[in-house]
Swiss-Prot record:
Keywords: Chemotaxis, Cytokine, Disulfide bond, Inflammatory response, Secreted, Signal. Disulfide bonds join 30-57, 32-74. This is C-X-C motif chemokine 11. Residues 1-21 form the signal peptide. Chemotactic for interleukin-activated T-cells but not unstimulated T-cells, neutrophils or monocytes. Induces calcium release in activated T-cells. Binds to CXCR3. May play an important role in CNS diseases which involve T-cell recruitment. May play a role in skin immune responses. SUPFAM superfamilies: Interleukin 8-like chemokines. Interacts with TNFAIP6 (via Link domain). The gene is CXCL11. One of its GO terms (cellular component) is extracellular space. It comes from the Eukaryota. InterPro entries: Chemokine_b/g/d, Chemokine_CXC, Chemokine_CXC_CS, Chemokine_IL8-like_dom, CXC_Chemokine_domain, Interleukin_8-like_sf. Belongs to the intercrine alpha (chemokine CxC) family. GO terms for molecular function: chemokine activity; CXCR3 chemokine receptor binding; heparin binding. It is found in: Secreted.
Length: 100
């Protein structure tokens, strides 16, 4: 293989290695699309999942699973209800790990 051919192959390999490190889309793969709802009836909440920022998604997501097969809703993490839920979960987790 000629020097010119080797240079082209090396350039392609380097470009592929560099491109592989970049995210495909800004923000990655967040589960919530858009800001989410501001509030949900407390009586309808079955489960709360809080997903903190990661390499895949740069925002905090609050996902509420509703009772009676009504599905899931994303709660706006800046909303008053979401802030209260996050605070409660953090307090519960800190008490849980405090006893270890």
């Amino acid at each position: 293989m000629s020097v010119k051919g080797m240079a082209i192959v090396l350039t392609v390999i380097l470009c592929a290695a560099i491109v592989q490190g970049f995210p495909m889309f800004k923000g990655g793969r967040c589960l919530c699309i858009g800001p989410g709802v501001k509030a949900v009836k407390v009586a309808d909440i079955e489960k709360v999942s809080i997903i903190y920022p990661t390499n895949n998604c740069d925002k905090t997501e609050v996902i509420i699973t509703l009772k009676t097969h009504k599905g899931q809703r994303c709660l706006n993490p800046k909303a008053k209800q979401a802030k209260a839920i996050i605070k409660k979960v953090q307090r519960k987790n800190s008490e849980k790990y405090k006893n270890i």
